[in-house]
Amino acid sequence: MKLIILDRDGVVNQDSDAFVKSPDEWIALPGSLQAIARLTQADWTVVLATNQSGLARGLFDTATLNAIHDKMHRALAQMGGVVDAIFMCPHGPDDGCACRKPLPGMYRDIARRYDVDLAGVPAVGDSLRDLQAAAQAGCAPWLVQTGNGRKTLAQGGLPEGTRVCEDLAAVAEQLLQEA
């Protein structure tokens, strides 16, 4: 199985300091849906791992989050792309959970669900916490320079072996060339 794990905000869609709180606020980044479609069509299983503390903060509810994800799934389907599963942490930063990135809990859940060893599985994010969680789980961290990615790159301290690409389309291109 060829598995790839993506962060959502800043990788697939535009990020917002005020959170993505409704389907109207969910706007795909240029080329991201096409990248997922290319990966899907090349037999990759695409999974999201996303912190959604807006739930804990009361900024939106589960029904709204599901509506946001429905919008994403519909847009992807039009291009032949599929996100097989969405793993998310609904907790706030101070809740003490094991699933909130930079902790690797969501990634370990993915490994159990798909019965895979995550060693070398590409995990794409735009923030240091995405990359830290991925590296702790044994994934190969990839930083995109969309969302908070440029700032993350400038701040340094990336996990060893982190690969850097302009955006998700460039990640997909690299992976498909290497396959």
From Swiss-Prot:
Pathway: Nucleotide-sugar biosynthesis; ADP-L-glycero-beta-D-manno-heptose biosynthesis; ADP-L-glycero-beta-D-manno-heptose from D-glycero-beta-D-manno-heptose 7-phosphate: step 2/4; Bacterial outer membrane biogenesis; LPS core biosynthesis. Transmembrane segments: none annotated. Mg(2+) binds at D7, D9, D126. The record marks R100 as: Contributes to substrate recognition. GO terms for molecular function: D-glycero-beta-D-manno-heptose 1,7-bisphosphate 7-phosphatase activity; magnesium ion binding; zinc ion binding. Its main location: cytoplasm. GO terms for biological process: ADP-L-glycero-beta-D-manno-heptose biosynthetic process; lipopolysaccharide core region biosynthetic process. It catalyses: D-glycero-beta-D-manno-heptose 1,7-bisphosphate + H2O = D-glycero-beta-D-manno-heptose 1-phosphate + phosphate. CDD domains: HAD_HisB-N. PANTHER family: D-GLYCERO-BETA-D-MANNO-HEPTOSE-1,7-BISPHOSPHATE 7-PHOSPHATASE (PTHR42891:SF1). Belongs to the GmhB family. This is D-glycero-beta-D-manno-heptose-1,7-bisphosphate 7-phosphatase.
